[in-house]
A protein has these predicted regions:
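Glycine-rich phosphate-binding loop signature in dinucleotide/nucleotide-binding domains
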Residues: 45-47, 149-158
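Short beta-strand scaffold positions
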Residues: 53-54, 162-164
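Loop-to-helix element that buttresses phosphate recognition and phosphoryl-transfer chemistry
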Residues: 11-69, 128-146, 185-186, 194
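Histidine-centered divalent metal-coordination motifs
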Residues: 9, 165
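Phosphate-coordination/substrate-recognition cap region in phosphate-metabolizing enzymes
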Residues: 38-112, 116-121, 174-198, 202
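Extreme N-terminal starter segment of soluble prokaryotic enzymes
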Residues: 1-5
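Conserved C-terminal alpha-helical bundle
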Residues: 112-138
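GST superfamily/GST-like fold recognition
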Residues: 166-171
Length: 211
């Protein structure tokens, strides 16, 4: 029976500093590096056929660390921005507490946790293209890639590991667990903890749990 492992990258430096990160390419914090090592220890005994990550270094480093610990540094890998974190627009780089003070906690919650309301798209130094995404927008780019590239591997009987981000993984889990828009808003994916999905030979999920 094939396994699918989903893992959010270890804590990043901006997670630690409580800043909106999005597509800004921030490295892991020391704690995040340790979380990646702990994930590797938990995954000893698992053998993978393919790995997928976003193009952001915090996800790449997390997967590289895991593969080093489990002795699979030659695993075929595919990196794609479809698995990137949600783009937080003009909020990228800003402290969440400061945003709450400036715009109010309710507005902060809407930008962070609503399904279809994106943050402001104003151009900034960290958002030169004026981009911004809601969770709905993130799912619209993540899920087609997941269904076209990742699930065919799983359905072919391959064991797959995906290292990505809170919101791209929320999009995937929403589909796999058949969550409603309301349910996914309450879903929190912790950093650095492998989430296992076990499939049967017909492509049905037999079990899923955190390791």
């Amino acid at each position: 029976m094939p396994n699918l492992i989903l893992i959010r990258h270890g804590e990043s430096q901006w997670n630690l500093e409580n800043r909106f990160t999005g597509w800004v390419d921030i490295p892991l914090s020391p704690k995040g590096e340790q979380e990646a090592k702990q994930a590797g220890e938990k995954l000893k005994g698992y053998k993978f056929d393919k790995g997928y990550t976003s193009v952001l270094k915090r996800a790449i480093k997390t997967l590289d660390t895991i593969l080093g610990i489990i002795g699979q540094t030659n695993l075929p890998l595919e990196r794609d921005k479809a698995l990137n974190e949600r783009h937080y627009g003009a909020l990228q780089g800003l402290n969440k507490a400061d945003i709450g003070k400036k715009y109010g906690e309710e507005q902060l919650k809407i930008w962070r946790r609503s399904y279809d309301v994106p943050p402001p798209k104003d151009k900034t130094e960290l958002n030169p293209d004026g981009i911004s995404e809601s969770l709905k927008d993130t799912a619209a780019r993540t899920l087609p890639y997941f269904e076209a590239r990742i699930m065919p591997d799983v359905l072919a009987g391959k064991n797959v590991i995906v290292a990505a981000h809170g919101n791209s993984l929320r999009s995937i889990v929403m589909k796999l667990d058949k969550l409603t828009k309301e349910q996914v808003l309450e879903l929190n994916i912790p950093t650095g903890i492998p989430l296992l999905y076990v499939y049967d030979d017909k492509g049905n999920i037999k079990e899923h749990r955190y390791l």
